[in-house]
Amino acid sequence: MAELTIDPASIRKALDDFVSSYKPSDTPTQEVGYVATAGDGIAHVTGLPGCMANELLTFEDGTLGLAFNLDAREIGVVILGDFAGIEEGQEVRRTGEVLSVPVGDGYLGRVVDPLGKPLDGLGEIQGIEGRRILEAQAPDVMHRHPVDEPLSTGLKAIDAMTPIGRGQRQLIIGDRQTGKTAIAIDTIINQKANWESGDPKKQVRCIYVAIGQKGSTIASVKQSLEDAGAMEYTTIVASPAADSAGFKYIAPYTGSAIGQHWMYNGKHVLIVFDDLSKQAEAYRSISLLLRRPPGREAYPGDVFYLHSRLLERCAKVSDDLGGGSMTGLPIVETKANDVSAYIPTNVISITDGQIFLQSDLFNANQRPAVDVGISVSRVGGAAQTKALKKVSGTLKISLAQYRSLESFAMFASDLDAASKAQLTRGAHLTELLKQPQFHPYSPEQEVVSVWTGTHGKLDDLDLKDVLPFEQGLLDYIDHNTDILKTIRETEEFTADTEAALDKAVDEFRSTFVSSAGKPLVEKKPDVDKAAPVDQEKIVAGEK
C-alpha cells in the first residue's frame, strides 16, 4: 500500500480555487413574521427581529402596515387601509422602506388618498417627479427666511386685521358650523389671479387635506373649487370618516410631503389641514389600542409632537434651498368656544397666530365671524402691503373699542356725543367687513373699502346701505379712475392717491341713492347765482 502524502501547497491551492469560484445563491432571504392578533385597524406581529421604527410591512393580501410599537416579543402595526382580510396566523414581510409618497406637478387637479393613489377616477397620475418620505425633517433655523411676502385671503376682515404671510402658520379655530372651512376655501380661490399671471414668483399651489370628514362634504369642496376654476392648481388629499384611523393619522403628513417637494423647488404652497382635531382623535385611538400610556383627555403624551413636527414643516426657506414657501392653515374645532382645551392650546402655541370664529357672531349674520379681540397674527404684519397697513392701522382698535363700548351702552341710558359717534363708526365698520362666500376681494379693493370705512365716509348711511354703497363705489372707481391700478402696481397708498380717492368717494356719494329712494347728498338750490339776476330786473324796471 502506497504511503499517503499531504502537500500543504496543494491544499492551499484547492481552497483558493474554491473561494475564488464560489458564487452565493440567488435565492433571496427575507424575514417573515406572523399575525398574532388583529382587529380595529391594529395588528400584533411576532417575529421580524430586524424591523425598524416606522418601517412599511406587507400582509398576505397586499395591505400595508406601519410598524408603530417595537416591543421585546412583538410589533404593534397600524394597518393602512381595509383590515377586514387580515387574520391571525397570516404571514407578514418587511419591505426595508419607510413610508413615502410620490410627488410632482401631476398631483395638481387630482384627489388622492393618504398613500398618493388617485380617488377621482381620472386614471393614473402622470408627471411623477420622485418620492418623498412622509416623516421628513422640517427646515432648520439657519435655512429659514423671515416672513415678508403677503398671502392674500381675499377676506377684508382677515387681510386688514390678522394678515397672513407666505411661510406662516395661521390657525383657524372655532366651534362647528362657524365657517372655518369656508375661509380656507375662499383663500384657495383667491389664488386664482396669481396662478393665471403665469409668474412663478406669484403662483401658489394649494393642497387641501380633508381628515375625517363626510365623503359628501369632500365632494362639495371639490365641486366648489371646480366651479371657481381653482382645481387647476389644487390637490385634495382625502381621508374621509369611513377610513381607518391609520389613514387619518398619516393624511396631513402626505399633504406636507407633496407640498415640501414644491417648496424646495422654489415654489410657493398653501396647505390647509381640515381639521387637526380629527387627526388627534385618530392618533389617540391608535395609541390606546396599542396600550400606550394615556395622558390628559386620554391623549398620549406625545400628541404635542404629533402637531409640532407637522406644522414646523411650513416655512419660508432661504435662497440656498430655493427660496420657496409653504403656508399652513390648520383648522381646529372647539366645543362651546373653549379655546383652553388640550388640542386647541397645543396648536395655538405652535402656530404664528389664530383666527377665532365666534358662533354668536356667525348666528348674528356677521360672516366671516372673526372675533377681533382673540384673533391675532404674530408675524403676518411684516408681510402686509404698505397700502393696506397704512389704511388699516386703526381698524382693529376701533372695532375692539366698539365691542367694549357696545356692551357698556346696553346698561347706560345716556351717552355723550363722542361715544355715540364711536358706536356709529363701529357699527358701520362691522357691517363693512361682512362678505359673502366665494367673493374674494383683490388687495387694492380692500384698501379702498377699508379707507372708506375708517375715514367716516359711511357713517351717515343706513346699515343696510353700507354693502351696496361699497359695491357701487368699487365699480365707480374701477370704471372712472386709475386708483385701483395705481395701488395694484405700486402697492403703496400715497398722499396723491388718497386725495384722488377722497375726491372720487365724494363724487360717488353725490350720485348714490339709498334703499329708501333718497339721495345721500341733497342738492341745494343755487340761491347765490339767482339773486343778482332778480336784482338786475328790478333795477331795469325802475329805470
From Swiss-Prot:
Catalytic activity: ATP + H2O + 4 H(+)(in) = ADP + phosphate + 5 H(+)(out)
InterPro entries: ATP_synth_asu-like_sf (IPR023366), ATP_synth_asu_C (IPR000793), ATP_synth_asu_C_sf (IPR038376), ATP_synth_F1_a_nt-bd_dom (IPR033732), ATP_synth_F1_asu (IPR005294), ATPase_a/bsu_AS (IPR020003), ATPase_F1/V1/A1_a/bsu_N (IPR004100), ATPase_F1/V1/A1_a/bsu_N_sf (IPR036121)
Entry EC number(s): 7.1.2.2
Subcellular location: Cell membrane
Membrane topology: Peripheral membrane protein
Residues the record marks as site: Required for activity: 375
Transport is among the record's keywords: yes
SUPFAM superfamilies: C-terminal domain of alpha and beta subunits of F1 ATP synthase (SSF47917), N-terminal domain of alpha and beta subunits of F1 ATP synthase (SSF50615), P-loop containing nucleoside triphosphate hydrolases (SSF52540)
GO molecular function terms noted in the UniProt entry: ADP binding; ATP binding; proton-transporting ATP synthase activity, rotational mechanism
Region: Disordered, residue numbers: 521-543
UniProt KW keywords: ATP synthesis, ATP-binding, Cell membrane, CF(1), Hydrogen ion transport, Ion transport, Membrane, Nucleotide-binding, Translocase, Transport
GO cellular component, one term: proton-transporting ATP synthase complex
Family of this protein: Belongs to the ATPase alpha/beta chains family.
Subunit and partners: F-type ATPases have 2 components, CF(1) - the catalytic core - and CF(0) - the membrane proton channel. CF(1) has five subunits: alpha(3), beta(3), gamma(1), delta(1), epsilon(1). CF(0) has three main subunits: a(1), b(2) and c(9-12). The alpha and beta chains form an alternating ring which encloses part of the gamma chain. CF(1) is attached to CF(0) by a central stalk formed by the gamma and epsilon chains, while a peripheral stalk is formed by the delta and b chains.
Cited HAMAP family: ATP_synth_alpha_bact
Function: Produces ATP from ADP in the presence of a proton gradient across the membrane. The alpha chain is a regulatory subunit.
Protein name listed in UniProt: ATP synthase subunit alpha
Organism: Bifidobacterium longum (strain NCC 2705)
Encoding gene per record: atpA
